[in-house]
Regions:
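Nucleotide-activated chemistry modules centered on ATP-dependent adenylation/adenylyltransferase
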Residues: 1-252
Length: 252
């Protein structure tokens, strides 16, 4: 759907398939806003395993993308040639920690965000014309994030006065709300150091094969740091959940 007034200008929606980015696309369609494509960058754990929580990845590829394409919105999927595992096992090449594996990314200084997500997006953005307009999913009740918008970025949620809760309800009504909102209020990779306890517990309970992969990485020697997040090793979290399970079984 291309604007007649600016038919040479591209309009692209950045899409994580969370509530805010999907609500942005739904609003564009509802109000006849120009929209040429949605762009999604998938971070990979390894060459075959997605970094998306499995329920969210299934929603993306089995529900959301087919639905958007039926509505006339093509979806472009970007990926880095680097995976989480590539970066985790990669060696530091300079400084006092030279030779050590990078290990778990630091909260607030995530090399995965930088190398596996931002770089593919920036590489793609360089192929676009300078006047390309980017729709971003920032709600009307997020003033700090709205203040950071650059000149080529537009929030349709702000334009149509949609809060985060409004965006969630819009997606729910349209049958396009990711199932991850049943146990979290945020998006993120299943190996994210910023993951909340409830998200980690979901991974532990429902995806033991992925949990085991993280314990394998914890056991890998020669890492810069043993901490998974700011305070704990992944094995500490595992031990805490096992203790919780044991107490529940004893109480039963």
């Amino acid at each position: 759907m291309i604007s007649k007034e600016k038919k040479n200008t591209l309009y692209i929606a950045s899409c994580s398939f969370g509530k805010d980015s999907l609500a942005t696309i739904l609003l564009a369609l509802e109000h006849g806003e120009p929209l040429d494509e949605a762009v999604y960058c998938e971070v990979m754990f390894d060459k075959r395993t997605s970094g998306e929580v499995p329920e969210h990845r299934a929603f993306i590829y089995e529900t959301a993308i087919p639905r958007l394409e039926r509505l006339g919105v093509p979806v472009r999927v970007l990926r880095s040639d680097k995976t989480y595992l590539d970066l985790f096992a990669g060696a530091i090449t300079r400084g006092p920690k030279k030779g050590l594996r990078r290990g778990f990314p630091l909260c607030g200084h995530c090399y995965v965000q930088r190398d596996c997500k931002l770089r593919p997006i920036r590489r793609y953005n360089r192929t676009l014309t300078p006047d390309t307009v980017q729709y971003v999913g920032i709600a009307s009740d997020e003033p700090v994030r709205l203040h950071r918008l650059q000149g080529d970025q537009v929030s349709l949620l702000e334009k149509y006065h949609y809060t985060e809760e409004d965006a969630k309800q819009l997606c729910q009504t349209a049958g396009l709300l990711s199932p991850v909102y049943a146990f979290t209020d945020r998006g993120g990779c299943w190996f994210c150091p910023n993951a909340k306890r409830k998200e980690l517990r979901h991974l532990y309970d429902h995806h033991p094969e992925l949990w085991a992969r993280m314990l394998e990485l914890q056991a890998m020697p020669g890492k810069v740091s043993e901490k998974f997040n700011r305070t704990e090793r992944f094995s500490d979290i595992d031990a805490a959940f096992r203790k919780e399970d044991a107490l529940c079984q004893k109480a039963a």
